[in-house]
Regions:
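N-terminal intrinsically disordered/low-complexity leader segments
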Residues: 1-5
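Helix-turn-helix
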Residues: 9, 13-51, 55
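A general structural signal for well-ordered alpha-helical segments in protein cores
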Residues: 49, 53, 78, 91-94, ...
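Hydrophobic/aromatic residues within well-ordered alpha-helical segments
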Residues: 49, 56, 60, 89, ...
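Amphipathic alpha-helical linker/stalk segments
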Residues: 54-85
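Helical hydrophobic small-molecule/effector-binding pocket
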Residues: 74-109, 150
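Amphipathic C-terminal alpha-helical segment
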Residues: 83, 99, 121-153
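Amphipathic alpha-helical packing segments from all-alpha helical-bundle domains
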Residues: 85-92, 105-132
C-alpha cells in the first residue's frame, strides 16, 4: 500500500470510528485494530489523536463540497438537501463537531467556514437563480425542511 493510500485508509477508518464512538470513545489502538495498520504507521502520519481528528474533518469537508446548479422546485431542493448536504453522515459529523468544538476550535472553525458556509452560499445562489417564489430565503427553506423532517421523528 502506498504511503498516501495508507494515510487515506487510516482517515476513512477513523471517520467511521469517530462518528460511531465520538472522540473520547475512539482510541488510536482501535483505529490501528480496525484499519489493520501498525501503531507506528498511524503515528508517522498523525502525531496524536487530535491531529487525526482534525485531518478526518478536513478531508471529509474537502470531499463533500456543494455541487448545486439550479433548483427547479421545492422537491428538487429537498432532494439536494437529503442526498448531498444533510446526509446521515453529515449530520453525524455536525454532532461530532458541535460536541467536540471546545476541544478542537480550529477544526470547528474550519468545518463551519469550509462546509456549512459553502453550502449556505451555494443554496443562496441556486435559490436566487431558480423558479422558486421571489423573496423566499434559504433560511426559510431550510427551516421548512427541518420542521418537516422533525415531524417525522
Amino acid at each position: 500500500m502506498a504511503q498516501k493510500s495508507k494515510k487515506e485508509h487510516i482517515i476513512r477508518t477513523a471517520l467511521t470510528l469517530f462518528l460511531e464512538h465520538g472522540f473520547k470513545g475512539t482510541s488510536v489502538d482501535l483505529v490501528v485494530k480496525i484499519s489493520g495498520v501498525s501503531k507506528p504507521t498511524v503515528y508517522n502520519h498523525f502525531p496524536d489523536k487530535a491531529a487525526l481528528m482534525h485531518s478526518v474533518i478536513k478531508t471529509w469537508v474537502e470531499n463533500n463540497q456543494p455541487t448545486i446548479s439550479l433548483i427547479k422546485d421545492s422537491l428538487a431542493l429537498t432532494a439536494i438537501i437529503e442526498d448531498q448536504w444533510l446526509t446521515s453522515e453529515a449530520l453525524s459529523l455536525y454532532a461530532l463537531v458541535i460536541g467536540e468544538g471546545r476541544r478542537f476550535p480550529d477544526a470547528k472553525h474550519f468545518f463551519w467556514h469550509s462546509f456549512d458556509a459553502n453550502w449556505q452560499k451555494a443554496f443562496t445562489n441556486a435559490v436566487d437563480n431558480s423558479a422558486l417564489p421571489v423573496g423566499l430565503t434559504v433560511e426559510a427553506l431550510l427551516d421548512q425542511y427541518l420542521i418537516t423532517r422533525l415531524k417525522k421523528i
